[in-house]
Amino acid sequence: MSYIPYVVEKTGRGERSYDIYSRLLKDRIIMLSGEINDAVASTVVAQLLFLEAEDPDKDIYLYINSPGGVVTSGMSIFDTMNYIKPDVCTICIGQAASMGAFLLSSGAKGKRYSLPNSRIMIHQPLGGARGQATDIQIQAKEIQRLKDTLNGILASQTGQDFATIEKDTDRDNFMSAEEACSYGLIDEVITKHK
């Protein structure tokens, strides 16, 4: 269990204590840290929906430091980012790998950023199957469908053609922030807060 700091905000009406993530949420900042699973995705989706309800015309900032995770969990975040009205600006801090990189590239065009020493990694979805031959065939067909879906979206987001994405995601493909910018996963490498 990691330590979560609290901050105290003083107002004319007294003091209020927030955990740091709740305080950042007041500034429309969502932190996506660690592995992406159903619990993390549910929290991020809820925060996106809450911030849209608060102000549908104001950008949301999604900071990403993630090794990736479950494809379906990540897709729930992706779909929500596209469903809500506000632009979602994505910023890589540390690393955005696998589904983390996919979500980084899914930010609003022109608003996808990385800090200079971050690393970004894309690859094909991982999976495993056990059971009877028919069950394994079903799972193989589904992972191929997910791979094609993800590659199609990445092609659209980066401006790369589908064949290039398919080749470049065949194995782990690590990029610096500058390389990710040239590739089209992000729009700009930033060193100072805008």
Swiss-Prot record:
Annotated protein name in UniProt: ATP-dependent Clp protease proteolytic subunit
Family classification: Belongs to the peptidase S14 family.
GO cellular component: cytoplasm; endopeptidase Clp complex
A molecular function GO annotation: serine-type endopeptidase activity
GO biological process, one term: protein quality control for misfolded or incompletely synthesized proteins
Intracellular or extracellular location(s): Cytoplasm
Entry annotated with the keyword Protease: yes
Function: Cleaves peptides in various proteins in a process that requires ATP hydrolysis. Has a chymotrypsin-like activity. Plays a major role in the degradation of misfolded proteins.
Chief place of localization: cytoplasm
Annotated EC: 3.4.21.92
CDD domains cross-referenced by the UniProt entry: S14_ClpP_2
Source species: Aliarcobacter butzleri (strain RM4018)
Subunit: Fourteen ClpP subunits assemble into 2 heptameric rings which stack back to back to give a disk-like structure with a central cavity, resembling the structure of eukaryotic proteasomes.
Lineage: Bacteria, Pseudomonadati, Campylobacterota, Epsilonproteobacteria, Campylobacterales
Cross-referenced InterPro entries: ClpP, ClpP/crotonase-like_dom_sf, ClpP/TepA, ClpP_His_AS, ClpP_Ser_AS
Domain of life according to the entry: Bacteria
